[in-house]
């Protein structure tokens, strides 16, 4: 704030010059100090593309973010280019509020940390700041894991923090059999649900059959409408040999499969279904 006025820095592709000017005018009339771009390289200011100028302007814009209380992203039709993506990550790291012209999928913890790595590689943030970013990332990741582990149901439970689902899966089951691009799909979700189904019997075959029966009778409609399903079969003995039988009832679904051993002396089996809508 400066003399009671909020300071807002505009970010986005300079191809949206008209939207920049309209937003600058509107936010100014709402009583804000607005910092915008100085040149529109994608809208006719060709000097931007001469040697050294674009790098200078990119560094300047990070300084403009430092001056602001908030950034406002001009993302017409949801478009966010690489430079803007890095500016969003930088603003988040610096604790700035972030608003968007249009509703869009917000970057994840992992997206922002990767973008900060690009800024560090380009020499635009210091070793010290990147080290701090890494520590912040670890703290937020651990908080997301704690959120995941603290959730007890009742199921299905709608997750407000999709990061919590991903972090929980990674933390509880490791990266084995999970492809990064599969996990990435979770962030495209409108909502993410988890259902946990406990087997009821004293032997593996009957345990898995009771789980399959529950899936078919209670969950197939929602599963059929999902974009992706993450299936984790947990058993007191190695459950990997039972995946084929389980997969028969999910034929045609986009599924990531994984197993986990339960450390218990009792005969037990549980299925986690995380499905993305």
Which stretches of residues belong to each language-model region?
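Generic anion/oxyanion-binding catalytic loop in active/binding sites
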Residues: 80, 119, 172
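Tubulin/FtsZ superfamily GTPase core signature
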Residues: 123, 128, 132-135, 139-277
